[in-house]
């Protein structure tokens, strides 16, 4: 694990998080449900994604044999690192978010509802 090459570290955490079932179940999926259900703006969604990054990263470091608390992770990752990770993970799950949002709000997102085969009630 190389803390000197920030982008490699960010890429490793992102790749690992997209394949980790516990991270998905505990942080990623609930964030998708919350932001899709409440139909948050893009910037509010990014704030929500940024909030889960320290927990996801702490799990990553622990699984890599370097147990860390969320507070310790916050000392390692810069605000820019957290933003990069949040944007990357959101991109990885954007289609799932759009489908979930269409299920909650089919009348507001009829194109997405149609794309995912969701009835709009029309």
Predicted region positions:
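Acidic interaction surfaces
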Residues: 1-122
